[in-house]
C-alpha cells in the first residue's frame, strides 16, 4: 500500500525532532575559546543554530570554520564568528552530519549536499570529529542504501566514469535541481555518485581517491564518536 502524505509528513516530523534533539546535545560539547568545525547539511544546520544561541545568550567565545557556503551563511546568521582554515592553527572539535553510519565501524558516507571535500578537510583536521545522526541513518553494512559521491574535476569526468565502469559499478553524474546540467560544487567540480561494495571503508576510501581526476570521495573512515537521536534519548557510539 502506498504511503499517504500524512504518513510521510509524520515520518519527516519524527526525523526532524530527532535531529533537533541531537543538535542540542552536540552544542553542549563546545567549550569557551574553542575553534569549531561547522559541518554542512540539515542536521549540521540545526547544530549551528543551537550553537549560535549559546554564543548570544552565554557570550560563548568561539570561532567557527565553515565547510560550505551554506554553513557559512547559517553561522553568520546565527551570530557565530568565523575564521578560515589557514587562519587557525588547529580545530578543537568538528561536528557534522552524515547520510549513512555503519554501526559496527562508525565509518560514514557523506556528500549528499556535495560538500564532502571541504567537510573532510575540516573534519579530519580536528582534534575530535563528532557525527550527528538520527537512528534512521544507522546501517549494518556501509553503502548498502547510499551511493558514494565523488567530487571530480570536469576535465577528467569521462575517464573517471570509464574507470568506475571497469570496476563493475554503475556510476551516474549528479544532475542539478533548478538548472539544466550537472551539479557544480563550491569548488567548481562535478559529482559522480556510485554504488560500490565497501568491505573495508579505509581501503575503499583510499582506492577511490587514487583514481586520477577524483578530488575526494564521500567515505569517511575516521570518526571519534557518533551522537544518535532516538525516540527515547541521545545515544553515544564510540570506537
Swiss-Prot record:
HAMAP family: Rib_5P_isom_A
A biological process from GO: pentose-phosphate shunt, non-oxidative branch
Catalysed reactions, as listed in the record: aldehydo-D-ribose 5-phosphate = D-ribulose 5-phosphate
Matches recorded under CDD domains: RPI_A
Cystine pairs: none
Family membership: Belongs to the ribose 5-phosphate isomerase family.
GO MF annotation list: ribose-5-phosphate isomerase activity
Assembly description: Homodimer.
Name the record gives this protein: Ribose-5-phosphate isomerase A
Binding residue positions for substrate: 40-43, 96-99, 110-113, 137
Entry keyword annotation includes Electron transport: no
One GO CC annotation: cytosol
Described purpose of this protein according to its UniProt entry: Catalyzes the reversible conversion of ribose-5-phosphate to ribulose 5-phosphate.
Gene from which the chain derives: rpiA
Top-level EC class: isomerase
EC numbers on record: 5.3.1.6
Pathway: Carbohydrate degradation; pentose phosphate pathway; D-ribose 5-phosphate from D-ribulose 5-phosphate (non-oxidative stage): step 1/1
Organism from which the protein derives: Methanococcus maripaludis (strain DSM 14266 / JCM 13030 / NBRC 101832 / S2 / LL)
Catalytic residues as annotated in Swiss-Prot or TrEMBL: 119
Keyword terms: Isomerase
